[in-house]
């Protein structure tokens, strides 16, 4: 299995990336306190919790008191340390495989009112919602990034006047771990549906599950944090921001100096600064943007403008969500932009969907291939084959001039 780590860092903490060292802790053993914590910060370690049960995904954990821990040792031997309330895995020896895969999926929700297919998960488990090939694509990714389009909370109150407000019980976050989720993207227009309480519950829940999140946080430094995915000596930075609710006082609050919320990109100045900052520390930088107009098959004026700005800032790939439908692919000054992955596990209608698989060459750090894998959301999610697969690829090709998409979904600039 590929050895990897994900580090979530603020600008100040990112300067410590080079100090991350390898840890070697046998399964079932305890790390000496405070040495694990000293990997990243000098704060005194409080405790090391040992997690003896099986874990379904690399970053899933179960612990009695995760909030007070400095480190957790999972049954697989993976050590997670903390920096500013986030779980961090230590860098390990390079794997013999010289490529890593990052899979992006679009909108997901586990609320049965908005996604009736999720009722299957409540009765039979999340695995029953995906066919074998789709499940293998998700769990087989070295890094899986999902757009988590709702808060995990039993509290809070719905945003007054907002037409659609969603929430799911905190325990359902376990399903993210079972799916193999490595990063939950929270910069969207629903994470704040149940106000500050709902947002804070979401952050606590994901911390407890050991699932890193980006795009929202307890304050602006937290919300702006970059995820640094490190494997085989290669670092890929991932940023997440939203422009949705394009008005001065949006329902979804922007994070402040001392208040929770999302990382907004209505004005891309700060996001572009974060891209440039990330490129100083990482080999590649990917932006996952929540943008666009619902139900439009191609990008709108704002996406066009912002894609240009993000590309000029140094983004190597831009991936989008929010429109609830698949949108076109375009190259902007040589930078691939997949404007919208659409709904993935969201909504009641049968809908074409899919995932974007990014393959990174770690010998000469670069994106070696981009593949769109067509899928169908209907009674769960299944991978398309034959004529239906080709139909979706043909439709994507028809709205993506300047791009060549082959029969397997691999695409390149014409």
Which functions belong to the PLM regions below?
Residues 28, 32-414:
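Acidic, metal/ion-coordinating pockets
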């Amino acid at each position: 299995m590929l050895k990897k780590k994900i580090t979530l860092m603020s600008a100040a903490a990112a300067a410590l990336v080079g100090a991350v060292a390898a840890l070697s802790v046998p399964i079932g053993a305890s790390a000496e306190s405070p040495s694990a914590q000293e990997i990243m910060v000098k704060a005194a370690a409080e405790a090391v919790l040992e997690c003896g049960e099986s874990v379904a995904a690399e970053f899933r954990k179960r612990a009695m008191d995760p909030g007070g821990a400095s480190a957790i040792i999972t049954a697989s031997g993976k050590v997670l340390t903390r920096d500013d309330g986030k779980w961090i895995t230590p860098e390990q020896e390079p794997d013999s495989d010289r490529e890593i895969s990052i899979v992006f999926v679009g909108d997901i929700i586990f609320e049965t009112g908005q996604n009736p297919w999720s009722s299957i998960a409540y009765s039979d488990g999340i695995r029953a919602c995906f066919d074998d090939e789709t499940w293998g694509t998700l769990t087989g990714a070295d890094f899986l990034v999902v757009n988590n389009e709702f808060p995990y909370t039993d509290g809070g109150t719905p945003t007054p006047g907002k037409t659609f407000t969603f929430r799911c019980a905190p325990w359902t976050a376990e399903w993210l771990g079972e799916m193999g989720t490595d990063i939950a993207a929270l910069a969207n227009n629903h994470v704040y549906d149940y106000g500050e309480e709902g947002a804070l519950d979401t952050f606590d829940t994901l911390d407890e599950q050991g699932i890193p999140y980006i795009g929202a946080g307890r304050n602006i430094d937290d919300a702006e944090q970059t995820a640094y995915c490190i494997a085989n000596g290669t670092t890929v930075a991932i940023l997440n921001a939203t422009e949705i609710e394009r008005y001065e006082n949006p329902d979804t609050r922007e994070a402040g100096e001392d208040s929770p919320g999302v990382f907004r990109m209505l004005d891309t100045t700060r996001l572009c600064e974060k891209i440039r900052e990330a490129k100083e520390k990482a080999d590649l930088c990917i932006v996952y943007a929540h943008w666009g107009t619902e139900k439009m098959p191609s990008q709108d004026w704002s996406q066009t403008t912002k894609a240009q700005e993000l590309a000029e800032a140094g983004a190597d790939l831009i991936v989008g969500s929010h429109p609830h439908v698949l949108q076109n692919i375009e190259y902007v000054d040589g930078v691939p932009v997949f404007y919208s992955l659409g709904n993935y596990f969201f909504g009641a209608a049968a809908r074409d969907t899919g995932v974007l698989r990014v393959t990174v060459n770690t010998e000469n750090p670069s994106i070696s291939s981009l593949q769109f894998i067509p899928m169908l959301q209907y009674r769960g999610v299944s991978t398309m084959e034959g004529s239906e697969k080709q139909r979706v690829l043909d439709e994507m090709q028809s709205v993506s001039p300047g791009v060549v998409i082959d029969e397997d979904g691999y695409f390149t600039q014409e």
